[in-house]
Amino acid sequence: MKNKWKRILIGILCVIFATIIAILVHALMPGPGTEVIEDDFDSKLVLALGFPVVASLYFVVLYLQMWGFMGILARKSKLSGPEIGFRFGISFAAIYIVGMQEVILSSSPFTEYGKDFFLYQLSMGLGDGIPVVLLCLALSALCFPKENIKKTGGLRITRDAIVYMLCVSCGFFTQRIIGYIFGYIDSDFKSYPLETILWALTMGATFGIANILISPVFCGNVAKQRMLSLLIISINWIWFNLFIGLIYEGLFLSMLLRGLCDFTGMLIGLFIVQRKGTEL
């Protein structure tokens, strides 16, 4: 019981430090246009609490999820703590960095897509990604049993893993393109079709790779591993998207829908893999 509370305290402290680092990194690595974007934050939450408080709470929840995923679901993993931390950290950092590049000018300080947009979004992605890598490595070093330290799973890129990755990637990509065409997902697809399609392809590939990296962390059969991996990635992705809904009035439901549709698309891809009976 004493060790349990010690792990909880360490986890909370790690989340707090990661949040502080995220705020500092965002402050130290501003992209072009950062001086004007805060003027547009008009949600009731921002008006009531202020943007710094809302942003801090967002990061706390984002990183608390990581602590829960690693500390609860991955605690009985056959892999070593450092390997778990590496897999989680790299996967979610990549999701944040690539996710920030989505071509949505309305949620940025820019009126056209170009170099400044790319650099600004890159700085925002790094501001989220660097702290999550440090957090996952710290949690794996401080909160996992020392007896697991010698166990390692390595990284196996098999044919079945590639099929799994491709199905998840295609599920995301297909859902996004359908959403852009029919308009239930807000985007700048009509103005920047090529850039939007390339981003959707890259984001889909990122989700696919993240899933094959994280799924072996969990215990159980392949189907359970894959479902857990997809669930935690989707939950975190939904919250990641909701940041825009937290700071801009009237966008919360549309951002929630965006994340849920992405999850649905990837879930369909997972079902296709399971139907074929492939295994990692």
Predicted segment positions?
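Juxtamembrane/disordered regions of integral membrane proteins
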Residues: 1-280
